[in-house]
């Protein structure tokens, strides 16, 4: 069986590893480096350069040199992150026909997966050159907080590169595999802090080591898909631009060539300041005006850099707290802290992480290579080369559908081990409804509008029946890659509709943080809203069934009794439109009291059959059946 290679497709750098016997080996590329810059350049000779050759010519070809493409993959053009990147990227980001963020290079429109595929092709060739055989299969890593669209786009990139992606695994989990097989002995609980070039993840992972069989179980994960080394670089670049503008009166932002030189120098200065207290950013002839050439020479201290990025590092701390809480662990339960991603080499990052966990992070795990090594290990597991290893990963956010009253009903909770499958029976909201709309959501809030919409689809051909009688089985199935498949089936007719969720936009930092943090901060208001909707649904159900009973008994009930029950129903309907839960409950009790009295009064006049069919219990939906706010889909004939 041919090798399944492991690829860390990074924002700033990428890395490839293979299993060599029982050890993972990181491979050197054609330039002799163990990591490859995730940079692609399109030259005037229509040549495509990848990695270091692309980086070398970036200063003279800024508009056709692409970097940090991972920040755009699976995102919509209108996303806040994309709009921020448009202002700072030298290349042209455009809106595609489906609303995604694409790149325009020399009047040619390219999708992010197409561009990422060029990097994957280089990784593939590196492995083929080393092994002397064709490579067809790979395990590719993604940030733990990547959503369905971003994971799917990564798989697409692999397919474009000629690879069958056997598994998509989360970067922190891959790092844990690398650590666990090499360094970890015995049972341990570890925290993997992964701050890369464009994304941040934290995962709490339990490693069980029993008779040399190791199980890696992810207990919780959290993160930010738009926080990384690129943001640190941009803070330093902005400082240098403003300092130069104040000193020379010239804004370098209008000069793409100057900005590309500045970006390269800022990145170099940032790296140098991890091992020295001060560095010079020296760029002679950075620009020129009517007075002649201008030179940039600015001293930057480590303290200055730290002051520029301190809030970015602080932003990474809140997800640590949430991940620990979700894992139901305290700081003292963490045995080891693993740092992954090049940005974790910054002393201030290491210091903040050590302060939080009250222990020094391990220094014996290579932050640039651990993820690729873990991907290779997983490849070895899938090919049978690696025995006695079981990986249990999780889904980062809850998944569900919109149900009656605008509530999100969760089918799969966040941090559920994947792959997983869950089904639940829902029903119709209207009499004789023949179609329903399934609205799929992702997030932690109770109200549908506060969560991320992943898509929707229709199930039609439902057999007409009174509301609450139809049985629609909705099934959520998350595969090993974390990609969601949804199906809806009418249990009466057997009709079924299936989709794979492929949302065209990613979950941005604001949305993700808002989903989880708001759920924590607004748990009380969420609970009140949930209780109000529950009472509303109860009132709506009672109003509907009582009106139905009233219609059946209209010939036997006298005018005064009809007037009394109609007044009570009108008051209930008015209360249902308001926000007062207590008032709705009062009006429900009034309707129940009057309707019970009328049914008892008119009981002798009914046949036992009609009595059974009109009893309050018969109109109630089955237990465990959730009322869903499904609207009938009607043909719009013109």
Curated annotation (Swiss-Prot):
Inducing factors: By stress conditions e.g. heat shock.
Composition skew (Low complexity), residue ranges: 608-619
GO molecular function, a single term: unfolded protein binding
Region described as Disordered: spans on this chain: 598-638
Alphabetical keyword list: ATP-binding, Chaperone, Nucleotide-binding, Phosphoprotein, Stress response
Pfam families per record: HSP70 (PF00012)
Positions of modified residues (Phosphothreonine): 199
Coiled-coil portions: none
InterPro entries (alphabetical): ATPase_NBD, Chaperone_DnaK, Heat_shock_70_CS, HSP70_C_sf, HSP70_peptide-bd_sf, Hsp_70_fam
Disulphide bond pairs: none
NCBIfam families linked to this entry: PRK00290.1, PRK05183.1, prok_dnaK
UniProt function note: Acts as a chaperone.
Protein family membership: Belongs to the heat shock protein 70 family.
Full protein name: Chaperone protein DnaK
Lineage of origin: Bacteria, Pseudomonadati, Pseudomonadota, Gammaproteobacteria, Enterobacterales
